[in-house]
Amino acid sequence: MSGYQHILIAVDLTPGSEAVAHRAQELAGRYGAKLSLLHVVEFIPVDPAGEALLPPPVDIEGELVQGARRRLDALCDNLGLQSAARRVEVGNIKAEILRVVAEEKADLLVLGSHGRHGLALLMGSTEKSLVHKTPCDVLVVRLS
Protein backbone atom coordinates (compact mmCIF):
# COMPACT_ATOMS: atom_id res chain seq x y z
CA MET A 1 0.00 0.00 0.00
CA SER A 2 1.47 3.33 -1.04
CA GLY A 3 -0.65 5.41 1.33
CA TYR A 4 -3.88 7.30 1.12
CA GLN A 5 -4.72 9.40 -1.93
CA HIS A 6 -8.08 10.91 -0.92
CA ILE A 7 -9.26 11.38 2.66
CA LEU A 8 -12.91 12.23 3.26
CA ILE A 9 -13.69 13.89 6.60
CA ALA A 10 -17.30 13.50 7.74
CA VAL A 11 -18.10 16.18 10.31
CA ASP A 12 -21.20 16.88 12.36
CA LEU A 13 -20.14 20.52 12.95
CA THR A 14 -20.09 20.14 16.72
CA PRO A 15 -17.01 21.38 18.63
CA GLY A 16 -15.37 17.95 18.18
CA SER A 17 -15.30 18.43 14.41
CA GLU A 18 -12.10 20.42 14.69
CA ALA A 19 -10.29 17.50 16.36
CA VAL A 20 -11.56 15.09 13.70
CA ALA A 21 -10.42 17.38 10.87
CA HIS A 22 -7.07 17.98 12.54
CA ARG A 23 -6.38 14.22 12.72
CA ALA A 24 -7.24 13.88 9.03
CA GLN A 25 -4.95 16.84 8.22
CA GLU A 26 -2.05 15.05 9.92
CA LEU A 27 -2.63 11.95 7.79
CA ALA A 28 -3.06 13.96 4.60
CA GLY A 29 0.26 15.69 5.29
CA ARG A 30 1.98 12.36 5.88
CA TYR A 31 0.66 10.81 2.66
CA GLY A 32 0.26 13.88 0.45
CA ALA A 33 -3.44 13.05 0.17
CA LYS A 34 -6.29 15.21 -1.06
CA LEU A 35 -8.73 16.27 1.69
CA SER A 36 -12.48 16.68 1.33
CA LEU A 37 -15.02 17.55 4.01
CA LEU A 38 -18.62 16.42 4.19
CA HIS A 39 -21.52 17.41 6.41
CA VAL A 40 -24.93 15.78 6.06
CA VAL A 41 -28.06 17.68 7.02
CA GLU A 42 -30.58 15.08 8.09
CA PHE A 43 -33.77 17.02 7.54
CA ILE A 44 -36.80 15.70 9.37
CA PRO A 45 -39.92 17.28 7.91
CA VAL A 46 -42.39 18.91 10.23
CA ASP A 47 -45.52 16.80 10.59
CA PRO A 48 -48.59 18.25 8.87
CA ALA A 49 -50.25 19.22 12.15
CA GLY A 50 -47.23 21.37 13.02
CA GLU A 51 -47.06 23.15 9.67
CA ALA A 52 -49.79 25.59 10.67
CA LEU A 53 -47.33 27.09 13.17
CA LEU A 54 -44.90 28.08 10.39
CA PRO A 55 -45.45 30.86 7.89
CA PRO A 56 -46.08 29.27 4.45
CA PRO A 57 -42.97 30.43 2.52
CA VAL A 58 -40.35 29.25 5.08
CA ASP A 59 -37.65 27.07 3.50
CA ILE A 60 -36.32 25.25 6.56
CA GLU A 61 -34.22 22.78 4.58
CA GLY A 62 -32.59 25.58 2.58
CA GLU A 63 -31.82 27.50 5.75
CA LEU A 64 -30.29 24.40 7.38
CA VAL A 65 -28.10 23.79 4.32
CA GLN A 66 -26.95 27.43 4.13
CA GLY A 67 -26.17 27.47 7.85
CA ALA A 68 -24.21 24.22 7.51
CA ARG A 69 -22.23 25.65 4.57
CA ARG A 70 -21.30 28.72 6.60
CA ARG A 71 -20.19 26.60 9.55
CA LEU A 72 -18.24 24.22 7.30
CA ASP A 73 -16.50 27.19 5.65
CA ALA A 74 -15.65 28.60 9.09
CA LEU A 75 -14.21 25.24 10.16
CA CYS A 76 -12.05 25.12 7.03
CA ASP A 77 -10.88 28.71 7.61
CA ASN A 78 -9.96 27.94 11.25
CA LEU A 79 -7.89 24.93 10.18
CA GLY A 80 -6.26 26.53 7.14
CA LEU A 81 -8.14 24.23 4.77
CA GLN A 82 -9.35 26.90 2.36
CA SER A 83 -8.43 24.76 -0.66
CA ALA A 84 -10.14 21.59 0.62
CA ALA A 85 -13.23 20.44 -1.25
CA ARG A 86 -16.38 20.60 0.84
CA ARG A 87 -19.88 19.27 0.44
CA VAL A 88 -23.13 19.67 2.31
CA GLU A 89 -25.66 16.97 1.44
CA VAL A 90 -29.23 16.42 2.61
CA GLY A 91 -30.54 12.99 3.53
CA ASN A 92 -29.88 10.00 5.73
CA ILE A 93 -26.44 10.45 7.32
CA LYS A 94 -25.20 6.89 6.76
CA ALA A 95 -26.53 6.63 3.22
CA GLU A 96 -25.14 10.01 2.17
CA ILE A 97 -21.68 9.32 3.63
CA LEU A 98 -21.54 5.96 1.82
CA ARG A 99 -22.69 7.58 -1.43
CA VAL A 100 -20.11 10.37 -1.21
CA VAL A 101 -17.28 7.94 -0.32
CA ALA A 102 -18.09 6.02 -3.51
CA GLU A 103 -18.56 9.12 -5.70
CA GLU A 104 -15.35 10.75 -4.50
CA LYS A 105 -13.41 7.46 -4.58
CA ALA A 106 -12.11 8.19 -1.08
CA ASP A 107 -9.72 5.60 0.32
CA LEU A 108 -10.00 6.76 3.94
CA LEU A 109 -13.05 8.03 5.81
CA VAL A 110 -12.36 9.97 9.02
CA LEU A 111 -15.17 10.68 11.46
CA GLY A 112 -15.68 11.35 15.14
CA SER A 113 -17.35 9.21 17.75
CA HIS A 114 -19.04 10.49 20.85
CA GLY A 115 -18.98 7.90 23.61
CA ARG A 116 -22.13 5.84 23.95
CA HIS A 117 -23.41 4.58 27.28
CA GLY A 118 -26.27 2.42 28.46
CA LEU A 119 -29.11 1.87 26.00
CA ALA A 120 -27.32 3.75 23.20
CA LEU A 121 -24.71 0.98 23.10
CA LEU A 122 -27.41 -1.60 22.33
CA MET A 123 -29.12 0.51 19.69
CA GLY A 124 -26.09 0.82 17.41
CA SER A 125 -24.59 3.99 16.03
CA THR A 126 -23.83 5.75 12.81
CA GLU A 127 -20.12 5.20 13.41
CA LYS A 128 -20.47 1.46 13.99
CA SER A 129 -22.59 1.04 10.89
CA LEU A 130 -20.14 2.99 8.75
CA VAL A 131 -17.15 0.98 9.97
CA HIS A 132 -18.84 -2.18 8.68
CA LYS A 133 -20.37 -0.85 5.45
CA THR A 134 -17.80 1.62 4.08
CA PRO A 135 -15.76 0.18 1.18
CA CYS A 136 -12.57 1.92 2.32
CA ASP A 137 -10.55 2.26 5.52
CA VAL A 138 -12.28 4.13 8.35
CA LEU A 139 -10.60 6.08 11.14
CA VAL A 140 -12.90 6.83 14.05
CA VAL A 141 -11.57 9.62 16.28
CA ARG A 142 -12.74 9.26 19.88
CA LEU A 143 -14.12 12.58 21.09
CA SER A 144 -15.08 11.78 24.68
PLM-predicted stretches and their roles:
Residues 1-2, 30, 76-109:
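Structural beta-alpha unit
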Residues 2-54:
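Small/aliphatic-rich secondary-structure junction motif
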Residues 38, 85-89, 139:
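General small-molecule cofactor/ligand-binding pocket signal
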Residues 55-68:
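A short acidic, glycine-rich active-site loop
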Residues 108-129:
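Glycine-rich, Arg-bearing micro-motifs that act as flexible, cationic patches
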Residues 126, 134-135:
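Short, structured coil segments at secondary-structure junctions
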Residues 138-144:
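Short, flexible loop segments at boundaries between secondary-structure elements
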